[in-house]
């Protein structure tokens, strides 16, 4: 038809913008969907499904992905984040397309089944995360969890929020007296330390909010003790579950190598391990997802290294050979699905011999033909 003659390729297909390195904290919309799943990733996904399903103590543990630079481990981590944290309606199309083949039926069904029951809330941490001392760990984790909740419009206040402030008032009364004296919003409800402690012990959320505002204004951060930090995380997890949208937390720590290779890396891992072990209790459904270089564990003695691996679904993420055709086809973003499919089928009906030529040396000709056809309109 006349309209088809005037049709441009851009009417049916566009090129995706792709970056050389994947940043989980600064993703483009839908960028995660350009990931090419392979058997290695599917093994990691299967481990994660078994962990989140939480019906087998041996599998109910956090995940640690170790891969050298350029293997796509951060992108793999981002895909796991979306598959377990986005709403099931937002991932269904991707899952049913990526895992449409019969050989993936069990994986596809397992994932959708577990997602119909569970949804995790994502928290991103990256690299050293300004942690110079052990006490900074709880501060940074609490800050990032609160930031993620706030960004999602979720308000949660738990018992440890109040307890830790009361504890700090006892330890540092001078700081708190200065805070009251310099902030009328706070002093109007709590003119002295005794009154402030009493209101916090009674769980007064309005006073807590005024305290937080006063802290922000004065640039003061109260560090939680690590034991309090652990309690706080699981109180937040339980409060989140009660709200009915998310079940628990997925704390993703990319470039975790920086933590492990820091001068206090071994001690930080011990502290994180205490949290990870509590996560393994059957009543909990929160997880760490650590993403690191394999060298991250070289800071530990061999026996401790093997023990650490056993506490996680520890998986090596290597660079697997992926068909160049498949990589190239992921650059395309289909604008008009129906028209694209029509034009593609028409083109290959006319040039069917191309498919035979390029797939004859493949170990999986059917998949190679599929990948080549998805390269249309590149020819």
Question: Whereabouts are the PLM-identified features?
Answer:
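Secondary-structure transition/capping motifs at alpha-helix termini
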Residues: 58, 87-91, 241-247, 275-286
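Walker A/P-loop-proximal flanking segment of P-loop NTPase domains
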Residues: 2-71, 77-78, 82-85, 97-101, ...
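Long, low-complexity, polar/charged, intrinsically disordered or flexibly structured peripheral segments
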Residues: 184-233
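Conserved P-loop NTPase catalytic core
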Residues: 101, 109-122, 126-135, 139, ...
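Conserved P-loop NTPase "ATPase switch" module shared by AAA+ and STAND
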Residues: 244-265
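P-loop NTPase motor core
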Residues: 32-35, 63-68, 77-192, 318-325
């Amino acid at each position: 038809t006349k309209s088809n003659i005037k049709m441009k390729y851009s009417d049916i297909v566009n090129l995706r913008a792709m970056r050389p390195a994947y940043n989980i904290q600064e993703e483009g919309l839908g960028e995660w969907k350009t990931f090419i799943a392979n058997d290695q990733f599917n093994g990691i996904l299967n481990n994660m499904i078994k962990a989140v399903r939480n019906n087998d103590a041996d599998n109910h543990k956090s995940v640690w992905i170790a891969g050298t630079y350029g293997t796509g481990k951060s992108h793999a981590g981002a895909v796991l984040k979306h598959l377990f944290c986005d709403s099931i309606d937002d991932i269904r199309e991707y899952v049913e397309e990526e895992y449409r083949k019969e050989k993936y039926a069990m994986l596809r069904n397992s994932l959708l089944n577990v997602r119909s029951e569970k949804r995790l809330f994502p928290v991103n941490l990256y690299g050293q995360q300004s942690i110079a001392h052990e006490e900074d760990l709880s501060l940074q984790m609490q800050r990032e969890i609160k930031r993620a909740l706030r960004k999602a419009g979720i308000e949660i206040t738990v018992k440890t929020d109040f307890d830790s402030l009361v504890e700090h008032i006892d330890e540092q009364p001078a700081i708190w007296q200065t805070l009251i004296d310099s902030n009328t919003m706070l002093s109007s409800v709590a003119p002295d330390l005794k009154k402030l402690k009493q209101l916090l012990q009674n769980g007064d959320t309005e006073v807590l909010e005024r305290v937080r505002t006063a802290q922000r204004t004065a640039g003061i951060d109260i560090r939680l003790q690590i034991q309090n930090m652990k309690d706080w995380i699981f109180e937040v997890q339980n409060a989140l579950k009660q709200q009915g949208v998310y079940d628990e937390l997925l704390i993703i720590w990319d470039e975790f190598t920086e933590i492990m290779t820091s001068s206090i890396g071994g001690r930080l891992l011990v502290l994180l391990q205490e949290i990870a072990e509590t996560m393994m209790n059957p009543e909990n459904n929160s997880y760490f997802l650590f993403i690191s270089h394999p060298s991250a564990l070289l800071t530990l003695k061999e026996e401790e290294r093997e023990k650490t691996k056993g506490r996680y679904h520890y998986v090596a993420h290597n660079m697997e050979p992926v068909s160049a055709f498949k990589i190239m086809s992921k650059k395309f973003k289909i604008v008009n699905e129906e028209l694209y499919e029509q034009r593609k089928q028409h083109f290959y009906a006319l040039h069917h011999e191309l498919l035979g030529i390029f797939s004859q040396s493949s170990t999986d000709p059917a998949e190679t033909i599929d990948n080549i056809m998805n390269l249309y309109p590149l020819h």
